[in-house]
Amino acid sequence: MSIEKLKAALPEYAKDIKLNLSSITRSSVLDQEQLWGTLLASAAATRNPQVLADIGAEATDHLSAAARHAALGAAAIMGMNNVFYRGRGFLEGRYDDLRPGLRMNIIANPGIPKANFELWSFAVSAINGCSHCLVAHEHTLRTVGVDREAIFEALKAAAIVSGVAQALATIEALSPS
């Protein structure tokens, strides 16, 4: 299992992250598609090749091809949107009257239940640090009936995956060349 490979790669100082990674993969708050889509989208958002490869390999056992496509699509479209909306937000409303003019069709037609795509977009927005998108996706999730516990679990999953990526990047940076 690739999650096991990630856990084995984590150093002793990241023991808490290792334990959290074990716990989140056994989550009963999210269904399997929600959980593994969140983990996969979050892994893509970290931009860490090892994290994406290992989580991606295991996610294949839990996600349909459509869900895998949508999770990776959520990471890609949020990579664009998070930069745009976070940047526009820094400009104190001076550009809010202008139409973005960016294609975002996957948001309207993700090929999976809309709530799951929103959950994955929410998780990626947390990793990418876009408060505008995070709030907007949380509002949509609450509007379509996703409970607070599921939203919070997705936030935890994103945080854990981000922590795994940070720990592995630290190991790589400190390794002798």
Curated annotation (Swiss-Prot):
It catalyses: N(6)-[(R)-dihydrolipoyl]-L-lysyl-[lipoyl-carrier protein] + a hydroperoxide = N(6)-[(R)-lipoyl]-L-lysyl-[lipoyl-carrier protein] + an alcohol + H2O. Keywords: Antioxidant, Disulfide bond, Oxidoreductase, Peroxidase, Redox-active center. SUPFAM superfamilies: AhpD-like. InterPro entries: AhpD, AhpD-like, AhpD_core, CMD-like. It is an enzyme of class 1 (oxidoreductase). One of its GO terms (cellular component) is plasma membrane. GO terms for molecular function: alkyl hydroperoxide reductase activity; disulfide oxidoreductase activity; hydroperoxide reductase activity; peroxiredoxin activity. Gene3D superfamilies: AhpD-like (1.20.1290.10). Disulfide bonds join C130-C133. Its EC number is 1.11.1.28. Changing C133S: Loss of activity. Loss of interchain disulfide bond with AhpC. Optimum pH is 7.2. Homotrimer. Identified in a complex with AhpC, DlaT and Lpd. PANTHER family: ALKYL HYDROPEROXIDE REDUCTASE AHPD. This is Alkyl hydroperoxide reductase AhpD. It comes from Mycobacterium tuberculosis (strain ATCC 25618 / H37Rv). The gene is ahpD.
